[in-house]
C-alpha cells in the first residue's frame, strides 16, 4: 500500500518504476540512480545492493544482515543506519549533498564480487575438487 501511495505522490518525479524487462534496462536504471535506501529485513547477500554500488549508486543501509560485513567492516559506517531517524537523516544528507556523493566511488567495495573476477576463482576451486 505504501508503494502505491508513493507512486501517486511522487509521480512527477519518478522516471522508472518496478520490474525492468531486460538486464540492459535494469543496468540503465542503476546508472541513472544516485541513492539506494534499503529498509529490507531480508536480503540474499545484498546482491542488488552490490550491483547498484558497482554502478556508483550511494547505498543507505540498515546496520544488519550482510550489510555490516560488506560496508561497516570496510570503514563505510556513513552508509549504515540503526533506526528510522538515522535513515531519514542520511537520506536528507545524501539529497542535500548529491554532488559530493556522486564523487564518492564505493565501486571498490563491489569489485571483489565482479563476475569477471569470481568466475576464475570458482573455476579454480571446482578444478581442485574434481581432480
How should each PLM-predicted stretch be described?
Residues 58-61:
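Short hydrophobic beta-strand element within catalytic cores of glycosyltransferases
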Residues 27, 45, 50-54, 68-69:
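Short alpha-helical segment that forms part of, or immediately flanks, the ligand-binding pocket
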Amino acid at each position: 500500500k505504501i508503494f502505491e501511495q508513493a507512486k501517486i505522490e511522487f509521480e512527477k518525479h519518478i522516471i522508472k518504476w518496478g520490474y525492468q524487462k531486460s538486464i540492459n534496462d535494469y543496468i540503465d536504471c542503476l546508472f541513472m540512480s544516485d541513492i539506494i535506501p534499503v529498509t529490507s529485513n531480508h536480503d540474499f547477500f545484498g546482491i542488488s545492493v552490490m550491483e547498484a554500488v558497482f554502478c556508483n549508486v550511494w547505498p543507505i543501509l540498515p546496520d544488519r544482515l550482510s550489510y555490516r560485513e560488506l560496508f561497516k567492516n570496510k570503514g563505510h559506517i556513513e552508509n549504515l543506519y540503526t533506526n528510522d531517524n538515522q535513515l531519514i537523516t542520511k537520506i536528507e544528507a545524501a539529497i542535500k549533498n548529491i554532488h559530493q556523493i556522486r564523487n564518492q566511488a564505493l565501486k571498490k567495495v563491489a569489485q571483489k564480487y565482479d563476475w569477471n573476477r569470481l568466475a576464475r576463482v570458482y573455476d579454480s576451486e571446482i578444478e581442485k575438487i574434481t581432480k
